[in-house]
Amino acid sequence: MKADAHRRHAESLERAIALAKSDPATSVAIIENAWGAAYHWISYGCIRKYQQHRDKHQGLTAYLVGLGEQRLAQWWRNFEDVRQAGFYGNQAGESEVQEVLELLERIRAWATT
């Protein structure tokens, strides 16, 4: 997938988040969509900055560390932890939603600057 396609996917998922935010019952969906948007922003940013990206989310943390992007790798690791706790562990409340939205904002800023 090319950089612009990753950007469009991220923006589409962010639009879905905006539509879902008014319903507290959608916290798991918000977290999942934020995670997906973050992945696409990371791919977009890696293509822009390094002319390459990882096609899969497995191993993404190590890939980012290999690029020298330790801070971004930590944000992704945090995203993975919150996502798994919400999806598999029933920990998807308001604070988790707020955390992933803040992480998503940081990742989008990294990708677009």
Indicate where each model-derived feature is located:
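Terminal alpha-helical segments
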Residues: 1-113
